[in-house]
């Protein structure tokens, strides 16, 4: 049952008391939805803001208005439906619409995202400006493009396209965009929403055919993540230019030789690397041969890159591609560079790391973490998702390489192991003392990071996020009361519901999800 406004106000006061008492979980809740810049004293309104954001509203005034207009219970279910459509949580969509078939009534953005052509036509018949009016953070075209409802109702594709045509006829733009978040104005295009976010090739093709810009700085890069080449081919066909982008480097993350071939044929240059921070984040990729080294690219990929002109003499953060190949254990690349006579000498620290990578006996050797080059400081986090790296990781830990240090995004190896759905490594990091209270740079805890990975990790189908979640729960992590309802994976939702019932002592109000 949804809490009343008065109860939520009391929750805000309780959160403030806990925050001012420096309780870890209260601090995490505020950090997950920061109402003000760091170190700015917080007021009562700021804690109301956190309570509203945890309830999936943009602000306390937005929550209060929704409660006054239609009742808090219905408003809360509408917010949950919006999230479910955006994330593609089919079982949540089904339950909400089965329980309340008219839940989208009066919510134009929801009606667009649900491909309700009849309702949208009715609204536009009396209010043509509705087609271009921003609703929340998104215009109607972005509500349509970022909806993953097509995977829940694929037979509604014709209605989806008819709705897109209707919006366009009433003034909407195929080049509409939306900010990443309320506090981050980096823009994500409707085309990215359709192709990169929603994996909706039907709508992506329609947008491109009607003039969407294929060079939006996001779509081509993220099209390499989808596990197929339809998006990459579609974008290249409509003029996407891979030169100067990191799309080729991202395709290497997935060992996708075919995508790399397509991008090279379209003009991609293997020595291109754009280190510009996007939306406040550093790139997830690095120059091609260094990328090949740390991703353990195989012979076909290495030969393809070298044939296309990748420079073995290129350095990144002061380290050669050859050193990377040895340190990360990619002997295929190391041999290829040696064959070209371009193998520089390794530093003493690199020799120790290379020995650990090759399976050599590290004996009593230890690395002073303070002397570890920055390029290798996060090596455990960088390799843990790769097959067969468990023993390598243990040798690195034995050498003294930090196993619980956060990277630039605040992600620790434990968080990444949980996100990747790797229970053996999740358990290993917990057993050797990783910090269970750590909150990463995205505001996530270990539990919320596992839930996020269960819906977003590209390899989630063959991973085991449920076992990672059990490991975290058995270690005693706090469980937000709404976690079972927030989980997008029905298996994890049921697991959490059962755990909450059997372990009420771990249940907490609010918190990152």
Regions found by a protein language model. Name each.
Residues 1-100, 110-114, 119:
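Intrinsically disordered, low-complexity eukaryotic regions enriched in glycine, serine
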Residues 38-66, 291-339:
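Extended, hydrophobic interaction surfaces within ordered domains
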Residues 94-102, 122-130, 162-174, 205-213, ...:
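Ankyrin repeat domain, specifically the short helix-to-loop turn at the C-terminus of the second helix
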């Amino acid at each position: 049952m949804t809490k009343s406004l008065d109860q939520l106000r009391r929750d805000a006061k309780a959160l403030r008391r806990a925050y001012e008492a420096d309780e870890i979980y209260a601090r995490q809740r505020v950090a997950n939805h920061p109402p003000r810049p760091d170190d700015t004293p917080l007021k009562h309104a700021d804690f109301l803001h956190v309570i509203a954001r945890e309830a999936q509203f943009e602000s306390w005034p937005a929550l209060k208005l929704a409660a006054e207009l239609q009742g808090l219970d219905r408003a809360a279910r509408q917010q949950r439906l919006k999230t479910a459509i955006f994330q593609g949580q089919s079982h949540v969509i089904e339950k909400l619409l089965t329980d309340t078939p008219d839940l989208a009534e009066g919510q134009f953005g929801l009606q667009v995202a649900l491909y309700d052509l009849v309702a949208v036509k009715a609204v536009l018949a009396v209010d043509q400006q509705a087609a271009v009016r921003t609703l929340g953070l998104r215009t109607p075209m972005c509500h349509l493009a970022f909806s993953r409802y097509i995977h829940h109702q694929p037979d509604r594709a014709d209605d989806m396209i008819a709705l897109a045509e209707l919006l366009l006829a009433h003034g909407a733009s195929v080049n509409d965009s939306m900010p990443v978040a309320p506090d981050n104005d980096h823009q994500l295009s409707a085309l990215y929403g359709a192709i990169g976010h929603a994996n909706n090739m039907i709508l992506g093709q329609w947008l491109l055919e009607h003039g969407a810009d294929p060079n939006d700085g996001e779509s081509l890069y993220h099209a390499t993540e989808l596990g197929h080449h339809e998006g990459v081919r579609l974008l290249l066909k409509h003029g996407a230019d891979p030169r100067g982008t990191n799309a080729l480097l991202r395709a290497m993350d997935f060992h996708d030789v075919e995508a790399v071939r397509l991008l090279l044929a379209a003009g991609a240059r293997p020595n291109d690397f754009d280190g510009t921070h996007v939306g406040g984040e550093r790139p997830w990729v690095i120059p091609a041969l260094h990328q090949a080294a740390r991703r353990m690219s195989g012979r076909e990929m290495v030969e393809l890159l070298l044939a296309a002109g990748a420079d073995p003499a290129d350095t990144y953060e002061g380290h050669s591609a050859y050193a990377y190949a040895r340190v990360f254990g990619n002997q295929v690349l190391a041999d290829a560079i040696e064959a070209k006579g371009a193998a520089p000498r390794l530093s003493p620290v690199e020799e120790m790391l290379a020995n650990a990578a090759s399976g050599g006996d590290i004996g009593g050797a230890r690395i002073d973490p303070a002397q570890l080059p920055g390029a290798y400081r996060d090596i455990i986090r960088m390799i843990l998702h790769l097959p067969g790296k468990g023993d390598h990781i243990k040798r690195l830990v034995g050498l003294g390489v930090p196993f619980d240090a956060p990277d630039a995004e605040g992600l620790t190896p434990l968080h990444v192991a949980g996100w990747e759905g790797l229970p053996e490594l999740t358990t290993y990091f917990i057993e050797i003392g990783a910090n269970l209270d750590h909150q990463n740079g995205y505001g996530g805890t270990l539990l919320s990071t596992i839930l996020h990975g269960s819906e977003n990790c590209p390899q989630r189908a063959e991973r085991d996020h449920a076992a990672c979640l059990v490991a975290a729960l058995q270690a005693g992590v706090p469980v937000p009361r709404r976690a079972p309802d927030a989980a997008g994976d029905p298996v994890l939702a049921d697991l959490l519901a059962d755990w909450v019932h059997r372990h009420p002592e771990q249940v907490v109000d609010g918190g990152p999800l």
